[in-house]
Amino acid sequence: MNEQQRLASQQVNSSTKKEEKDYSKYFESVYQPPSLKDAKKRGKEEVKIERDFGLPEEFRNFGTGRKFYIRTYGCQMNEHDTEVMAGIFTALGYEPTFSTEEADVVLLNTCAIRENAENKVFGELGHLKALKRRNPDLLIGVCGCMSQEESVVNKIMQKNQHVDMVFGTHNIHRLPYILKDAMFSKETVVEVWSKEGDVIENLPKVRRGDIKAWVNIMYGCDKFCTYCIVPYTRGKERSRRPEDIIQEIRHLAANGYKEITLLGQNVNAYGKDFEDIEYGLGDLMDELRKVDIARIRFTTSHPRDFDDHLIEVLGKGGNLVEHIHLPVQSGSTEMLKIMARKYSREHYLELVRKIKEAIPNAVLTTDIIVGFPNETDEQFEETMSLYREVGFDTAFTFIYSPREGTPAAKMKDNVPMEVKKERLQRLNALVNKLAIEKNNRYKGQIVEVLVDGESKNNPEVLAGYTRTNKLVNFVAPKSLIGQLVKVKVTDAKTWSLNGELVEEPIEVE
């Protein structure tokens, strides 16, 4: 997910520094640092569903004459959370701006999945410090997954005392109250909930576009992979009720949206927390096949929860696309066990076989971690061989990044960083090799493309995606933006296809 280019900082006069203090007291009742033992004890406590979200009278026109700016880091869930916060700001009367210089409120919606993401946030906070000196009335906030980590929040408070508010992932709906407190408080407002929040329906949203939309179907994760901070920052698995999801998607379809992506930290665990009905992702997808919308995707999947019923439903096609993102992380059963992925290499390959049998034209992509603590050359080679055997179209690849509080962060590691980097280079070379081979097979084919807009590299060229998530660039009238068209592929590159328009537009059945 690309971030907006960092705005240049300006030299300004210093302002009075806030009194240094210990912020840990704010966490005593609402926050506990990551604990695998305690987190695994969380059971199927009843999750309340609040359907009557509304702004109290005291907040009417609260933001009139003010502007907000949100910078988002990380995954699609964060992007969607930003849409919700933008909706709340708009309901309060704020106007959006694309410049921190013009903003009255700046929020950084953060990601904690890797150290690099956290470093970017701290770097941005450093830039914003100068802006705060220049404009003391500016409110600066940090939210998202980093805010759920006590050590990170303490670091923010100690080294970035120009931050006015910190809140987490479970209480976004409390944004109006947090803003009000920050506006009138002389000290930083910290509101971080350790316990998962309820499911809040009917929150206002300002979606990024009018062609594609993200729809949360569940929150949290109960898998506790040893390297992952998400179960701690996002909480236990909580599923939205199917009728609420279907209603939202029907509403989006009625408003002209062409593609929906169902979101969840572990999306195919959907429904496992229901106690009154037996209902999973396969059941939901089967019902969504009947909705009059062109395409439905979902992300992100865990192989452990990818069941036969879901595969059977996906095989029915229709508006259910043929692209499946299925993170494997490693091709070594030994490594997978240490990662606590709860499946083996053989199980993953059998799952892939079932998917390809039910969906012969399925396109699979994945995530892979290299350099996990004590990964041997042989174990890395198993990852390379699995990649070839599956025949992925592409992959997101990473060097392992320790996350404080996770079991893996305590593991001793004897693999030098130079070796990890060399392995990543070799893996990326394989990813690139297979990507161009896969794309070359599209030459001469006619594909269905949902036109997103102008190409980022050439405004005279349109760009869109196939059902299998291939980027296609082609020359056509801008009036086709938002439409489904047929394009003949004329050239293939590693990460995209070029083509010629052959038919416009396609009616959605």
Curated annotation (Swiss-Prot):
One of its GO terms (molecular function) is 4 iron, 4 sulfur cluster binding. SUPFAM superfamilies: Radical SAM enzymes. It catalyses: N(6)-dimethylallyladenosine(37) in tRNA + (sulfur carrier)-SH + AH2 + 2 S-adenosyl-L-methionine = 2-methylsulfanyl-N(6)-dimethylallyladenosine(37) in tRNA + (sulfur carrier)-H + 5'-deoxyadenosine + L-methionine + A + S-adenosyl-L-homocysteine + 2 H(+). Residues 16-25 have a biased composition (Basic and acidic residues). [4Fe-4S] cluster 1 binds at C75, C111, C145. Residues 1-15 have a biased composition (Polar residues). Its EC number is 2.8.4.3. PROSITE patterns: MTTASE_N (PS51449), MTTASE_RADICAL (PS01278), RADICAL_SAM (PS51918), TRAM (PS50926). Monomer. This is tRNA-2-methylthio-N(6)-dimethylallyladenosine synthase. It comes from Bacillus cereus (strain AH187).
